[in-house]
Amino acid sequence: MRYIKSMTQQKLSFLLALYIGLFMNCAVFYRRFGSYAQEFTIWKGLSAVVELGATVLVTFFLLRLLSLFGRRVWRVLATLVVLFSAGASYYMTFLNVVIGYGIIASVMTTDIDLSKEVVGLHFVLWLIAVSVLPLIFIWSNHCRYTLLRQLRTPGQRFRSAAVVVLAGVMVWAPIRLLDIQQKKVERATGIDLPSYGGVVANSYLPSNWLSALGLYAWAQVDESSDNNSLINPARKFTYVAPKDGDDTYVVFIIGETTRWDHMGIFGYERNTTPKLAQEKNLAAFRGYSCDTATKLSLRCMFVREGGADNNPQRTLKEQNVFAVLKQLGFSSDLYAMQSEMWFYSNTMADNISYREQIGAEPRNRGKTVDDMLLIDEMQNSLAQNPEGKHLIILHTKGSHFNYTQRYPRSYAQWKPECIGVDSGCTKAQMINSYDNSVTYVDHFITSVFDQLRDKKAIVFYAADHGESINEREHLHGTPRNMAPPEQFRVPMLVWMSDKYLASPQHAQMFAHLKQQAEIKVPRRHVELYDTIMGCLGYTSPNGGINQNNNWCHIPDVQKVAAK
């Protein structure tokens, strides 16, 4: 006991790091390394060693940094690190839970009764048993030589700072090396995998809950800032809800780089959309994006027309339609194969999971990270919201370059393909790979429909921008005032389930949509806000919905004819 009391704060931090990093993560080690052992390679063995070391060193790095606040504050913060890590380890060990944004958001909910429901006697016993030893160490130790004190003491500054910096470098450098190695494997095989460092950070304590907590805090600050700075249509306008909307499911699929002129349903010579072509409840429009890059389009495609400035950076002025639906009583989940966190937080979604978190899920370890992983997330979301009035946002990777990485080998029907980034592909090879990716998009979209056929549901799809695939220009992102037309060509789809169409009003809306699609009426991103609200049956007596932009608005002449 005397040794524990007299131990330096640096030694105590390392001892705690061993306990948290190794003991509390042992269930994760077992699951991750168990799969490594089945097909062992030198790189997998090296990965195991790196991950073991990283969990210890990152915890040591954290605890030493926290001692910059002084001895008393360090004890409190270290106690919280131990307790939070012990609590998280219970769910990771016994329930195989991946601690991410959604878990943290659920824990931080203001509904304390709901949070209590997941805390039982076994959890309390585990928390006490796992935490008691490190807490005794923390509160018995004199905490001599905190980093704050050492930095203030001549002769100790360089050495103490060097140890902390070295720990950080020893975490970052090996993981970075393995990340580079994984990228080489991806380029050689055409298989797309999540960031190695991102998966590691989302898999182990304490980095998983710390990163999720940081993301949650940032989202709250960002949301609060946006609430104060952005115009809120839900407050500015009056929205009248439809009488039969409380059991409705809404899904919005955000596509990536897919062009309508490479889709069979729009007359393209190749049958790239065989499944969508069979959908009787689908209205498909030739659309035009508001910009040519993902980040810019996400700013302007979900707000009211004029809700984003027309400047190069597309400065936001208003909240988006998803935030408005949330304020109108919808629950919402967002699942993404990308990492546009600024946008995700602006949706006010109850739960957000992005590609690294999804890739870290036990059921997804070792799998290619493609859009179909979102289907499992969607199924869970539907199961957890059986009553409806629920919004699901799916942000896909769609047809983004490298096109060949966007689909499995079974979808490689047009060859030769563009295999690698540096392989100097011909235009024909790039088009073959691009068209294969569009066929996989077709499969993904109809898989979303399959989850909703027995529900009262409406699905919207719109790609964020188009793509250039020719000898002179490639990819996208050209400034919109000089971008070629193909970078603006995006498919925009509306699908309604049979139960949704059982309503005469909805059936009339859909008939109007089909009529407009058949005569090839062009549609725009900036019409999505009014269309989503209008197709759900919302009305606004004071201008909250621009009927000129509402695809589901039936002109008075047609209403009279219908009667």
Curated annotation (Swiss-Prot):
Protein topology in the membrane: Multi-pass membrane protein
Molecular function terms from GO: phosphatidylethanolamine:Kdo2-lipid A phosphoethanolamine transferase activity
The protein's Enzyme Commission number: 2.7.8.42
Transmembrane segments: 10-30, 49-69, 80-100, 118-138, 160-180
Cofactor needs: Ca(2+)
Record topology, Periplasmic segments: 31-48, 101-117, 181-563
This protein's name: Kdo(2)-lipid A phosphoethanolamine 7''-transferase
Organism this protein belongs to: Salmonella typhimurium (strain LT2 / SGSC1412 / ATCC 700720)
Gene encoding the protein: eptB
